[in-house]
Amino acid sequence: MKNKFNLTREQNVFVAKRNIVDYIWKSANLEGIGVTYPETQVIYDGGIVNGLTVDKIIAINNLKYAWQFILENEDIEYDYKTLCQIHKLTCDKLVLDQNLGRIRSTPVNIGGTKWKPEFPIESQIKEELEGLLNQSEKTKTEIAIEIMLWIMRRQMFIDGNKRVAMLFANKIMIDNGCGIITISQENQPIFFEKLIKFYETGDNADLKQWIYDTSIDGIELSNN
């Protein structure tokens, strides 16, 4: 699985900033936060949107702050601490303080399937993440997608796992000039169908390839 894009970090950050509202809008809807693109733009710009719940407005602002965090902090490690920090940013005021930036201690149910994720154990999470990162034979794009899917299936937090997964993966993508993982609105039903299958089987091959084929954004640079 080759890198689709070979950008500098500066170029990749430019791509992200240029399309940031679109990425936030799609990410929010992927997590079931029903907002329109214009509403997302207004919230991002600090405006007021009538008719939206407070939680939806908070969720959009949290995604804004989390994106700023990954774009402005090149030197942060791809580790458990960063996972927890991203969760703090994305879920601030949306989960109880005792759950913010901490792995869950209660069971969770997954919509659309009877499958249930196992309880996360901090030492196992750290070991599994390190193993995924240290795959020298794979490209950064493939590693980022695998880590994103692992976070989603692991369900280590009480809420917001897909948001955390995409942000953490995109931190890896951006730092290595590989583009941006973003799932379009029209592709989200297919994504969820494949995600449920992945949850139930643990086999990421089909979903990983589909994300690679359909859901990586970037720019082609001219050689001139």
Task: Specify the residue positions occupied by each region the protein language model found.
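FIC/Doc superfamily catalytic core
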Residues: 1-224
